[in-house]
A protein has these predicted regions:
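Conserved short submotifs of the Hanks-type protein kinase catalytic core
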Residues: 99-112, 116
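A short, aromatic-enriched beta-strand patch in the conserved N-lobe beta-sheet
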Residues: 93-94
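Conserved end of the kinase activation segment
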Residues: 221-230
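Activation segment signature within eukaryotic-like protein kinase domains
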Residues: 131-132
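Conserved N-lobe beta3->alphaC-helix segment of eukaryotic protein kinase catalytic domains
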Residues: 60-83
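Protein kinase glycine-rich loop
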Residues: 33-40, 44
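Glycine-rich ATP phosphate-binding loop
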Residues: 43-63
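Terminal C-lobe "cap" of eukaryotic-type protein kinase domains
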Residues: 298-321
Length: 321
């Protein structure tokens, strides 16, 4: 039982004195299923509230796995307690035992909707605008709180092979991009909203951030010492490029086994903004869509669109007309 002022989530405190939860407090309230997924910092379960029978996502961080894991858990808790937005997966409950952190979040079940869309053979501009608009509004909200997500991306499966080989393969034929890694449909309804998840790498922007994180393709900071909110807008430009064309904007034709030269060449292209709107994949894409991608992937951070500016770009009205 927590002493003192009641906490909105479990018994987590960051003061000098800690009142840890007993593991039984977690299992008394929730049924934890089998592991759904193991990630770099945590294990993910489906959990059922024993009283309401409502299903949640549970993320378990093991303290014994090291300082980075403990930092990731604390960071995700801190950020998620600050935010409330319809396009951000909400934190419901938190417990800290002596050995673990347990985070209970809303359960998003709609990844299969991406499969349905990609089964049609392409991701239309209208489909893409529906995704990008919602994510952009969430990112603009985060940025208003000076929060940088730093890890917006699509899954690496398949992408690394396209990037590594330099072969331009369209997404449906290649079977990649079955879902966005931390951008998911909330449910399986046709008009489901999009939600952002995974905030363990997010950071409060107190001045410019120094340490790089995330995937180089989405972070044009590989050669920069400091960066901030513009990095999320760059990432959204990369995501928009991939959704519209089925291909990554940056790839290198160096042999897969020549990792050092491959990485150098890829990073050079990212830093130079060296990408093209390749035919035939971009032949039927509107000029306004290409304009938004270009403004989001502007190498000069000072010239790059902010999330709020991107929301007002003409592309959205062009698609809706």
């Amino acid at each position: 039982m927590c002493a003192g002022v009641a906490m909105p989530f479990g018994c987590l405190t960051f003061g000098e004195k800690k009142d840890y939860n007993n593991p039984s407090e977690v299992t008394d309230k929730y049924d934890l299923g089998q592991i759904v997924k193991s990630e770099e910092f945590c294990e993910i379960f489906r959990a059922k509230d024993k009283n309401t029978l409502k299903m949640y996502t549970c993320k378990k961080f093991l303290k014994k796995d090291g300082r980075k894991v403990r930092k990731a858990a604390k960071n995700e808790i801190l950020i998620l307690k600050m935010v409330k937005h319809p396009n951000i997966l909400q934190l419901v409950d938190v417990y800290e035992t002596r050995k673990e952190y347990y985070l209970f979040l809303e359960l998003a079940t709609g990844r299969e909707v991406f499969d349905w869309i990609l089964d049609q053979g392409y991701y239309s501009e209208r489909d893409t605008s529906n995704v990008i608009r919602q994510v952009m509004e969430a990112v603009a909200y985060l940025h208003s709180l000076r929060i940088v997500h730093r890890n917006l991306k699509v899954p690496d499966a398949g992408l690394s092979q396209v990037v590594g080989s330099g072969v331009a393969l369209h997404a449906p034929a290649f079977g990649m991009l079955l879902f966005l890694e931390n951008l998911v449909y909330y449910n399986r309804l046709k008009n489901s909203k999009i939600v952002i998840s995974d905030f363990h790498l997010a950071k409060l922007e107190n001045g410019l951030i120094k340490e790089p994180c995330g995937t180089p393709e989405y972070l044009e900071v590989v050669g920069r010492q400091r960066y901030g909110r513009p990095v999320d807008c760059w990432a959204l430009g990369v995501i928009m490029y991939i959704l519209l064309s089925g291909n990554p904007p940056f790839y290198d034709e160096t042999d897969d086994d020549d990792y050092e030269n491959h990485d150098k060449n890829l990073f050079r292209k990212i830093l130079a903004g060296d990408y093209e709107f390749d035919s035939p994949y971009w032949d039927d894409i509107s000029d306004s869509a290409k304009s938004l991608v270009s403004r989001l992937m502007e190498v000069d951070q000072h010239q790059r669109l902010t999330a709020q500016e991107a929301i007002n770009h003409e592309w959205y009205s062009d698609v809706d007309s």
